[in-house]
């Protein structure tokens, strides 16, 4: 691993992990090159959404099963192991202490999350600790008004190469494969006693049945 190779941070509830998450992680790794490290960070106690249905231990176990055989992707337990409320700025502060001040950190978020960024705790500190990579969705256009518009004009990257030339401070955009899979849809199917196969790895589906998560029956 090169000293200043980027670390790409993909957070989420992963409740459960599915092929949409995995494809996103793989495409991010391929985009930034073989030296890039992609970390999937399952959330702990998120303040901006309802608590996950499965425990942190179960979600970690499903992630481990899903990532078997893919060494370019790894799990970071920083938020799951934290007690109390979990905020992105605290996660980035911990990661900065771990990797130092020179290595690029690239925090990935969707368009909805980016538009709500000014509501996040100590949001202006986030860009001091990491870059932000926004995953475009089809038909999305950004309204460049208000404080977020000013923020983007100040920090917008000319190209995504800017995100690997310095440790933090830039906002980039990327278009990835849209798979139309959601964890809530997987849970809905399970609750209806319908199979979610081909939406998530078979190993994860077996684990869900084994532990009767989301109302699954171990058949």
Swiss-Prot record:
Pathway: Cofactor biosynthesis; NAD(+) biosynthesis; deamido-NAD(+) from nicotinate D-ribonucleotide: step 1/1. It catalyses: nicotinate beta-D-ribonucleotide + ATP + H(+) = deamido-NAD(+) + diphosphate. HAMAP family: NaMN_adenylyltr (MF_00244). The keyword Cytoplasm does not apply. It comes from Hahella chejuensis (strain KCTC 2396). The keyword Zinc does not apply. NCBIfam families: cyt_tran_rel, nicotinate (nicotinamide) nucleotide adenylyltransferase, PRK00071.1-1, PRK00071.1-3. Its EC number is 2.7.7.18. GO terms for biological process: NAD biosynthetic process. Pfam families: CTP_transf_like. This is Probable nicotinate-nucleotide adenylyltransferase. Belongs to the NadD family. It is an enzyme of class 2 (transferase). GO terms for molecular function: ATP binding; nicotinate-nucleotide adenylyltransferase activity. Keywords: ATP-binding, NAD, Nucleotide-binding, Nucleotidyltransferase, Pyridine nucleotide biosynthesis, Transferase. Catalyzes the reversible adenylation of nicotinate mononucleotide (NaMN) to nicotinic acid adenine dinucleotide (NaAD).
């Amino acid at each position: 691993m090169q000293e200043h190779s980027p670390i790409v941070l993909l957070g989420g509830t992963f409740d459960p992990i599915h092929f949409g998450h995995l494809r996103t992680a793989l495409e991010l790794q391929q985009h930034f090159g073989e030296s890039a490290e992609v970390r999937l960070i399952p959330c702990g106690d998120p303040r901006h959404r309802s608590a996950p249905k499965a425990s942190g231990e179960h979600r970690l176990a499903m992630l481990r099963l899903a990532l078997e055989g893919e060494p370019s992707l790894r799990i970071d337990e920083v938020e799951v192991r934290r007690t109390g409320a979990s905020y992105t700025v605290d996660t980035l502060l911990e990661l900065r202490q771990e990797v130092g001040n020179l290595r690029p950190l690239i925090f990935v978020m969707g368009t909805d999350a980016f538009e709500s960024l000014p509501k996040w705790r100590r949001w202006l500190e986030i860009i001091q600790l990491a870059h932000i990579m926004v995953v475009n969705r089809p038909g999305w256009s950004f309204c460049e008004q208000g404080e977020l518009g000013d923020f983007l004009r100040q920090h917008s990257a000319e190209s995504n190469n800017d995100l690997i030339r310095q440790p933090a401070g830039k906002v980039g955009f990327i278009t990835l494969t849209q798979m139309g899979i959601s964890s809530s849809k997987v849970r809905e199917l399970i609750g209806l006693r319908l199979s979610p196969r081909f939406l998530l790895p078979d190993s994860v589906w077996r684990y869900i049945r084994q532990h009767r998560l989301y109302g699954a029956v171990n058949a």
